[in-house]
C-alpha cells in the first residue's frame, strides 16, 4: 500500500508540474503577443506622425522665404493647417483608444432623444463635408429615448458619416434609425460609394486599418467606434451582403427600466 501511495503522489506531482508548465507557456505567449502588439503600434504611430510632421516642417520652411507670392503663401498655410488638424486628431484618437482599452474613459449616461441627436449630427456633417453626395437622415420614429452618453454616441455617428464622405463623391449617404426590437435600437450608415473589398471587411475594425492607404486619417477611428459601442452596450458590424457601396450597422439597448435615470460609469 505504501508503494501505491508513492506512485499516486508521483503521478499527482507530475500532473501539477505539467499544468504549471502549460500555464507558464501560456503566460509566455501572452507576453510575446503583447510585445509584438506594442512594437507594431509604435511602428505604425511613428509612420502616421512622421507624415504630418514632415509637412509642417517643410511648408513652414517655405514660408520663411521672402520671395514667395501670396498665392503660394496661402497654399502653404492651408497645408500646415490641414496637417496640424490631422496630427491633433491622431493624438486625440490615441488618447481615446488608450483610455477605452484600460477602462479610464468616463461615460456619462442620461436620457437622450436619439432622433433629435441624429438630426443634429446630419446638420454638423452637412457643414463640414467635402463631397457632392447628399447626406440624409431616415427614420419612421418621431422620437426614441435612450439611456446613453450622447457625446460618445454622436462621436461614433460623425466618424461613420465622415468616413462615408471620403469614399462617396456622388450619390447619397444615409443615416437610418429604427427600433429593431422592443429593447434594441438599430443605427445604420449606408453610402453609394466605392465600397469595401471583402478581404478588408474582416479586419476593418483593427487598429491602423485604413480603407484607403492614400487617404488622410489615423486608421484608428473604427477601432474607437467599436470600443465605444461596446461600452454603450451594443455591437457594430459591416454588412457583407451590401454591394452598392458600404453599410455599417450598430445596435444600442433600450432599457425601459432606466427611463429617467442618470449615471456615470
Residue locations for each model-derived region?
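Primarily the dimerization/phosphotransfer
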Residues: 23-65
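Short alpha-helical segment of the dimerization/phosphotransfer core of two-component systems
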Residues: 29, 82-87
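Helix-loop junction within the histidine kinase core
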Residues: 98-109
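Conserved catalytic submotifs in the C-terminal HATPase_c
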Residues: 108-113, 132-144, 180
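Short conserved segment of the HATPase_c
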Residues: 196-208
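Short alpha-helical Gxxx[C/S/T] motif in the catalytic ATP-binding
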Residues: 221, 225
Amino acid at each position: 500500500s505504501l508503494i501505491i501511495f508513492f506512485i499516486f503522489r508521483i503521478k499527482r506531482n507530475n500532473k501539477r508540474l505539467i499544468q504549471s508548465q502549460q500555464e507558464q507557456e501560456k503566460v509566455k505567449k501572452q507576453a510575446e503577443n503583447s510585445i509584438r502588439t506594442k512594437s507594431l503600434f509604435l511602428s505604425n504611430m511613428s509612420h502616421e506622425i512622421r507624415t504630418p510632421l514632415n509637412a509642417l516642417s517643410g511648408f513652414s520652411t517655405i514660408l520663411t522665404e521672402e520671395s514667395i507670392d501670396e498665392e503660394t503663401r496661402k497654399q502653404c498655410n492651408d497645408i500646415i493647417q490641414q496637417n496640424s488638424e490631422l496630427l491633433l486628431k491622431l493624438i486625440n484618437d490615441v488618447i481615446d483608444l488608450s483610455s477605452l482599452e484600460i477602462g479610464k474613459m468616463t461615460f456619462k449616461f442620461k436620457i437622450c432623444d436619439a432622433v433629435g441627436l441624429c438630426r443634429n449630427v446630419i446638420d454638423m456633417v452637412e457643414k463640414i463635408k467635402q463631397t457632392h453626395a447628399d447626406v440624409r437622415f431616415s427614420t419612421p420614429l418621431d422620437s426614441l429615448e435612450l439611456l446613453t452618453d450622447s457625446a460618445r454616441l454622436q462621436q461614433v455617428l460623425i466618424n461613420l458619416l465622415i468616413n462615408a464622405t471620403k469614399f462617396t463623391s456622388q450619390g447619397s449617404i444615409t443615416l437610418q434609425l429604427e427600433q429593431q426590437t422592443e429593447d434594441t435600437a438599430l443605427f445604420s450608415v449606408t453610402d453609394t460609394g466605392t465600397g469595401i473589398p471583402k478581404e478588408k471587411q474582416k479586419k476593418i475594425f483593427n487598429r491602423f486599418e485604413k480603407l484607403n492607404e492614400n487617404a488622410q486619417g489615423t486608421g484608428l477611428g473604427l477601432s474607437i467606434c467599436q470600443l465605444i459601442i461596446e461600452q454603450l452596450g451594443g455591437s457594430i458590424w459591416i454588412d457583407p451582403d451590401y454591394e452598392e457601396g458600404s453599410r455599417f450597422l450598430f445596435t444600442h439597448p433600450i432599457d425601459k427600466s432606466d427611463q429617467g435615470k442618470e449615471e456615470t460609469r
